[in-house]
Amino acid sequence: MGQLRTRKRGSTWEWSFEGAKINGKRNPISHGGYRTKAEAITAGTQAKAEYDSAGRRFTPSDISVSDYLDYWYDNYVKTNLSYNTQKDYEKKIRVHLKPAFGKYRLASLETDIIQKWIDGMKRQGYSRSMVKNTLSCLSGALGYAVYPWKYIKYNPCDYARIPKIVMSDEAKAHTEYICVKEDFAAIIERFGPDSNFYIPLMTGYHCGTRLGEAYGIDLLHDVDFERHTITIQHQLTNEGGKWYYRPPKYDSVRTIKILPEYEKILKTEIHNRKKNMLRYGQYFTKTYQMDDGLIFQAPSNVKIVGKEIMPISAKENGELLTPYSFKYCAKVIHEELGNPLFHSHCLRHTHGTLLAENGAQPKTVMERLGHKDIKTTMDRYVFNTEKMQNDAIVILADAIS
């Protein structure tokens, strides 16, 4: 490329240099309006360096890990990952990765530094899942530095190992809690059909949905009563104070069979919702899904250009209910019902375990729960219950005899 040049034009200074030829013709690049020659040289030097680096504002061999993480976040995370994942990664970068690695050059970061950090997180008492997820964030960033960006030759995270981290008995009990029939019956007795939490609870129990997926069901478009199916194609998620329909985690859109008992619950809800529309008239709040996934609500007498939907959970007057409200339900179960192990995800664990202990094939359970692989299903969502152990003994006895 040509050398940087400066010249005075009137009362101001301009920098210029020759860019790559286009169709065999010269491609001069310039910018003016600087008060002094020194200002023009400084700005021109920066512009030429950025041009020579194909628009990058840094030299890959010199960039710090801190600046690279910012670059990766702006150019990959914001473009390709969901809002909630963006927020999660932003926090992991700010709280964990920059303090640990930000001062190093990207090109000099090696596995031993990463391994010391992992071991340090264990000593500080972080859970295995926290260590694993934070390392995954770093590995994802460095993986893109290898390919497609080719800033470094290999990913040093590939050779790091997470040591054995023993889960406390309390944490293990919470994670592996299965909501047995007696516990669920007590919950439904407290939050019966007239409660706003009845349908989300029954949806988690009958369909094994994530909490956001349960609240993301549209009764107008996602339920097929003729085929006895429900399609899980959205999760209701909060982005900057607004609610959106977004694809499920891992894009795990799926259509699953539902029981007559659950169908009856949904039919009753649709019937009651229509009755309330007539009862409230113009004061009923209708719900719409906009083109960008935004969930928008307006009085029924206001015409909105958007897809009208019927959220599975709403107040009597149609106002949207969200996963945030479920915190109250969990609090009541903990304190009033004396069940501190309950959490919204346990209904998903319960669903998978009930299927497995009654003979459902692992692949069927995996697809019903919307997992990306069977290992996740069997390791984290299907627990070895006493019934399974007893069944195994019966099978063994039959085989031996």
Q: Which residues make up each language-model segment?
A:
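Catalytic-site neighborhood detector that most strongly recognizes the C-terminal catalytic loop/helix
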Residues: 236, 369-395
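Conserved tyrosine-mediated DNA breakage-rejoining catalytic core shared by Y-recombinases
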Residues: 16, 162, 217-293, 297-301
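Short, basic (Lys/Arg/His-rich) helix/loop patches that form interaction surfaces
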Residues: 124, 189-194, 207, 256, ...
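Basic, Lys/Arg- and aromatic-enriched nucleic-acid-binding interface segment
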Residues: 128, 132, 136-137, 148, ...
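Short, Arg/Lys-rich segments that mark the N-terminal edge of DNA/RNA- and chromatin-recognition modules
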Residues: 1-33, 229, 234, 241
